[in-house]
Structures are given as C-alpha cells and as structure tokens.
C-alpha cells in the first residue's frame, strides 16, 4: 500500500473489514451506506478495501450509518485480529502433525 507501512496498511484493512462486516450484517450495499454516511460510494469501497485513511469525522459518520458506536468498530477490529491469530495457530498445528 503506497505511503503506508505494512502495519499501517494492516490497520486500514482491519478497519475496512469491520465496516464491511457491519454493512453486510445490515444487508445494505456500499451505495446505501454511502448515502446514509455522506461520502461517495467509491470512498466506502476504498475504506472497505483498506485503501483509504479514514478521518475521525468519517469514522463517526460511517459508524452512525451502521447504527453502532464508533468504539464498536474498533472492538470488531480486535476480533478480526484474534481470529487471524487463531487461524495461524491452527495452520501451524496442522503443519506440525502433517510433516
């Protein structure tokens, strides 16, 4: 991701995944979320793909459009990270027993 460290890029991707999970949970399109939150649909797509560094105002607007507190989006990011760690542990255990 140009201009961002790998760690920063991962944060943006995790935030985007949290927004996408919230949107999917509501069963709404990127366009509908954009209409509710204010930014353009392509901006929402960029956020979900981890390509946009989201401002504090847009974090609040997206959260409100999803019907959640902004803090809950960050809590979801922790869950995503924990699930990735569990996945890597699982794969490591499989590798140990297979090889």
Which role does the model predict for each range below?
Residues 1-4, 9, 64, 72-99:
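Short, charged recognition helix plus adjacent turn
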Residues 2-25:
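A short, Lys/Arg-rich alpha-helix, primarily the initiator
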Residues 17-36, 61:
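Short basic helix-loop element that most often maps to the first helix and adjoining turn
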Residues 19, 33-34, 44-47, 73:
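Conserved hydrophobic/aromatic packing and binding residues within compact polymer-binding modules
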Residues 24, 38, 49, 60, ...:
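Residue-level detection of the helix-turn-helix DNA-binding "recognition helix"
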Residues 38-54:
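Recognition helix of helix-turn-helix/homeodomain-like DNA-binding domains
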Residues 55-72:
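DNA major-groove recognition helix of helix-turn-helix/homeodomain DNA-binding modules
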């Amino acid at each position: 991701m140009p201009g961002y460290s790998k760690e920063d890029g991962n944060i943006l991707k995790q935030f985007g995944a949290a927004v996408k999970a919230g949107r999917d949970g509501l069963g709404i399109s990127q366009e509908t979320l954009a209409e509710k939150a204010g930014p353009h649909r392509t901006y929402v797509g960029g956020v979900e793909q981890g390509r946009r560094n989201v401002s504090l105002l847009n974090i609040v607007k997206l959260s409100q459009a999803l019907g959640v507190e902004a803090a809950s989006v960050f809590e979801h990011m922790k869950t995503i990270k924990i699930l990735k760690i569990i996945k890597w542990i699982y794969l490591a255990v499989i590798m140990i027993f297979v090889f």
